[in-house]
């Protein structure tokens, strides 16, 4: 009798615990159409809904706190309920079911279970995963989960997977239309062999492919390393037919969406403008569609230019008539057969085939793996008569292609270097033409004796160029001798970035015309340019008298080349020619933040929502540098003039010449010479040369106060009572007049609490002691958590003014407080 009583009490307590939980469905606690279940952290909600322009009722999961209803999973997608009589419950067999008022089952988890039905319950997890659990003697066991049945949205911690041995396949499936969640014609998933690759199908027809996975990103999509890094994507493969992929976003709102038209979107929620923001869309152009140009042809998308398809060198259209009519699907054929295929070359005297090099490519479909190293990769292709091309990727190794080359695309930005096999005769034609040109030039040279003097002068310049190149190599070797420098040189090779010729950049910038000049910094001028293919660029031309040496130049190149994030400016390449040193960036059409923020006219274009979005973007870019990138980066020169704005006024952190990389066991670095900009430097850095993550947080706090107030920090230079903006904000805070700090342009009562919170967080960031300042991750949480209680700020650091010989900088936002120089650093352990 006692044992029976204990068992009864146990069941009562278990049932009571589940009934009190709002994220649980039990055998006795079903919910009806008007009711919902909410996950523990209120991120997701499970209930009934009707799509736009539809009267059918579906049981589904959606984001809970997003005003735009965004459904991530639907139970009865194939069988809507025609009225509001629906209910979700645990059946007597132990399955989670969706039924209508007549008891007809419209959907079921449909699992076979060996235990009693009253020990089953369903729970909506904080990840958006709906799970069916059974309680046994050993604890709760997951019997079914919605993440194992993905639909059109791919959430953090979900997996896409394919196993050819077991037949298991987890892939996205589009809705039939935006108003009909039943399965559509498009799906997206992974193919495991010969290399893991992300693909989109229309029915069974391949529509788009990402290119092979190289261990860090998919190499067939421009900027995929930048996009995917936002999500900490991981992919595992056994190279025998099994592959799986998952990712982790900064928040659970990040996701991928496969829409009913077959496009994959990467989205996250923009709090400032209250809408979904799209960061990536594939396919996005006609060239992205699989095999648009057919075999042996490359597609290059340029708005307004036709045709997008071009036969690669050594090939011609298979049908000129079809090609000229815009039908490129037949592709191209060789002009001359390969030597190993020629029937006229069996005497052993034939010349070997060669390779033509093409850059910035999406590699063709269906590569094969070779065990050859980088030096032997070309020979391994030449030894195989069926091999038509090769490429080498450091993450994959040697890649070989046989037969027709399909789905090639030329990018304007990043891409793979690719080598296509051609007959020796194709190179002879070029050689003959070169001989004619050379003879003509020599004859002309004899007619102009004065060119001898010019040639001698060029020889002298060439020696000077060699000296500078040798100096660069010596600096690279010196950089490698440092532990941190070795990481830079080994992991981020300069040769992996495009090397621009000086003449190309001179033409692009109209010979560095004053009309193309965007601005002037301490290290040189920045010019707008346009490359021949139509891509707008920004060229930072370092002054010959600049304080930025080779080490800083190399530092900026190697640091920013692989640190790619939507809130960091992207480096496209560089130029080293003679004494010229230039950096080529993506062009930011709206210039820098201070050009808007401190201009009486332009600042009116920055309303509060826009300014908050800028604050959020700066924080997320800094979060990536400090925590989410493969190496911890301290910027050291964060200021409004180093925040660039794109066409939508989204911020991008720039100018990494003074940035420093921390290894895994360091959290603080000591320097013998302080570099940066007065007013943005933390006190421990300005006074003692110590810098860390919290030094950047201090700079972030100053920028935050500048954005809220619309006033430059240095505008208090002649103010005897307030040495800087932080001191002024602190005085207003203590007197309860902090709202007086706010720029009148942005103040509206509906935003007052949010603006006050930003002032509060800004003061927390500029506190005197580094340990008192929050991390960037905490700053992001503080800014987005409306109901959280923030700690009271302590007095900011009021740094005494110093002369320019003591405080040095990479820019010239205030000529009284910044000049340029080189920083020597030493590492300090924890």
From Swiss-Prot:
Keywords carried by this UniProt record: ATP-binding, Calmodulin-binding, Cell membrane, Disulfide bond, EGF-like domain, Glycoprotein, Kinase, Lectin, Membrane, Nucleotide-binding, Phosphoprotein, Plant defense, Receptor, Serine/threonine-protein kinase, Signal, Transferase, Transmembrane, Transmembrane helix
Record SMART domains: B_lectin, PAN_AP, S_TKc
Cellular compartments per GO CC: extracellular region; plasma membrane
Annotated Protein kinase domain residues: 512-798
Primary enzyme class: transferase
CDD domains tied to this protein: B_lectin, PAN_AP_plant, STKc_IRAK
Extracellular-facing ranges: 22-434
Gene Ontology molecular functions: ATP binding; calmodulin binding; carbohydrate binding; protein kinase activity; protein serine kinase activity; protein serine/threonine kinase activity; ubiquitin protein ligase binding
EC number per UniProt: 2.7.11.1
Catalytic activity: L-seryl-[protein] + ATP = O-phospho-L-seryl-[protein] + ADP + H(+); L-threonyl-[protein] + ATP = O-phospho-L-threonyl-[protein] + ADP + H(+)
Alphabetical list of PROSITE patterns matching this protein: BULB_LECTIN (PS50927), PAN (PS50948), PROTEIN_KINASE_ATP (PS00107), PROTEIN_KINASE_DOM (PS50011), PROTEIN_KINASE_ST (PS00108)
Signal peptide span: 1-21
Domain PAN span(s) in chain numbering: 340-423
Membrane-spanning ranges: 435-455
Annotated glycan sites: 40, 53, 82, 327, 384, 432
Entry protein name: G-type lectin S-receptor-like serine/threonine-protein kinase SD1-13
């Amino acid at each position: 009798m006692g044992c029976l009583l204990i068992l009864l009490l146990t069941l009562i307590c278990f049932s009571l615990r589940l009934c009190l939980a709002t994220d649980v469905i039990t055998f006795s606690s079903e919910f009806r159409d008007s009711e919902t279940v909410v996950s523990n952290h209120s991120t997701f909600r499970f209930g009934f809904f009707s799509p736009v322009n539809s009267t059918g009722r579906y049981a589904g999961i959606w984001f809970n706190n997003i005003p735009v209803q965004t459904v991530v999973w639907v139970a009865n997608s194939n069988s809507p309920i025609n009225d509001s009589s629906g209910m979700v419950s645990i059946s007597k067999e132990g399955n989670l079911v969706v039924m209508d008022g007549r008891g007809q089952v419209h959907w079921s988890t449909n699992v076979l279970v060996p235990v009693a039905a009253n020990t089953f319950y369903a729970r909506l997890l904080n990840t958006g995963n709906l799970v069916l659990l059974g309680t046994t003697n050993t604890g709760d066991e997951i019997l079914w989960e919605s993440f194992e049945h993905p639909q059109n949205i791919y959430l953090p911690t979900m997996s896409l997977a394919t196993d050819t041995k077991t037949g298991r396949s987890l892939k996205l499936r589009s809705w039939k239309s935006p108003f009909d969640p039943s399965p559509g014609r498009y799906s997206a998933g992974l193919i495991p062999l010969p290399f893991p690759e992300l693909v989109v199908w229309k029915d069974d027809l391949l529509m788009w492919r990402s290119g092979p996975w190289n261990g860090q990103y998919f190499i067939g999509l421009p900027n995929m390393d930048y996009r995917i890094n936002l999500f900490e994507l991981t992919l595992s493969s056994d190279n025998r037919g099994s592959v799986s992929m998952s990712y982790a976003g900064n928040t659970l709102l990040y996701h991928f969406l496969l829409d009913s038209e077959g496009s994959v979107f990467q989205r996250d929620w923009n709090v400032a403008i209250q809408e979904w923001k799209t960061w990536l869309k594939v396919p996005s152009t006609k060239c992205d569609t699989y095999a648009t140009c057919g075999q042996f042809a490359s597609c290059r998308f340029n708005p307004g230019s036709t045709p997008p398809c071009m036969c690669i060198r050594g090939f011609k259209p298979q049908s000129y008539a079809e090609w000229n009519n815009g039908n490129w699907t037949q592709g191209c054929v060789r002009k001359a057969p390969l030597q190993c295929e020629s029937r006229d070359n069996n005497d052993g005297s034939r010349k070997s085939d060669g390779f033509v090099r093409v850059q910035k490519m999406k590699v063709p479909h269906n590569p094969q793996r070779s065990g050859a190293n980088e030096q032997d990769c070309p020979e391994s292709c030449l030894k195989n008569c069926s091999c038509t091309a090769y490429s080498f990727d450091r993450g994959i190794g040697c890649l070989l292609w046989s037969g027709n080359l399909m789905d090639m695309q030329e990018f304007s930005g990043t891409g793979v270097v690719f080598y296509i096999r051609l007959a020796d005769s194709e190179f002879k034609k070029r050689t003959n033409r070169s001989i004619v040109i050379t003879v003509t030039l020599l004859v002309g040279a004899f007619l102009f004796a004065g060119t001898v003097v010019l040639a001698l002068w060029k020889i002298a310049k060439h020696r000077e160029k060699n000296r500078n190149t040798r100096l660069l190599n010596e600096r690279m070797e010196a950089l490698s001798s440092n532990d941190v420098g070795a990481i830079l040189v080994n992991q981020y090779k300069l040769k992996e970035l495009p090397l621009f010729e000086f003449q190309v950049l001179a033409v692009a910038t109209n010979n560095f015309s004053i009309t193309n000049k965007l601005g002037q910094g301490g290290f040189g001028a920045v010019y707008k340019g346009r490359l021949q293919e139509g891509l707008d660029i920004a060229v930072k031309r370092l002054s010959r008298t600049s304080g930025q040496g080779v080490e800083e130049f190399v530092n900026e190149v190697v640091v920013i080349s692989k640190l790619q994030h939507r809130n960091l400016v992207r480096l496209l390449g560089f130029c080293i020619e003679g004494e010229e040193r230039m950096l080529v960036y993506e062009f930011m059409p709206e210039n820098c933040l201070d050009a808007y923020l401190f201009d009486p006219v332009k600042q009116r274009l920055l309303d509060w929502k826009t300014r908050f979005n800028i604050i959020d973007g700066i924080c997320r870019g800094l979060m990536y540098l400090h925590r989410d990138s493969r190496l911890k980066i301290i910027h050291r020169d964060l200021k409004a003039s180093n925040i660039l704005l794109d066409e939508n006024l989204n911020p991008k952190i720039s100018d990494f010449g003074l940035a420093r990389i921390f290894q895994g066991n360091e959290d603080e670095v000591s320097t013998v010479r302080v570099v940066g900009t007065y007013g943005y430097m933390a006190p421990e850095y300005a006074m003692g040369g110590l810098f860390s993550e919290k030094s950047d947080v201090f700079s972030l706090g100053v920028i935050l106060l500048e954005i809220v107030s619309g006033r430059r920090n240095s505008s208090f230079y002649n103010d005897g009572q307030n040495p800087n903006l932080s001191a002024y904000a602190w005085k207003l805070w203590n007197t309860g007049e902090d709202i007086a700090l706010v720029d009148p342009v942005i103040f509206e009562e509906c935003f007052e609490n949010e603006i006050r919170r930003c002032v509060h967080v800004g003061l927390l960031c500029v506190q005197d002691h580094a340990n008192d300042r929050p991390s960037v991750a905490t700053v992001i949480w503080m800014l987005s958590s409306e109901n959280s209680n923030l700690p009271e700020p302590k007095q900011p650091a009021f740094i005494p003014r110093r002369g320019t010989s003591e405080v040095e900088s990479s820019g010239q936002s205030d000529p009284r407080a910044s000049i340029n120089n080189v920083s020597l650093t030493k590492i300090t352990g924890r």
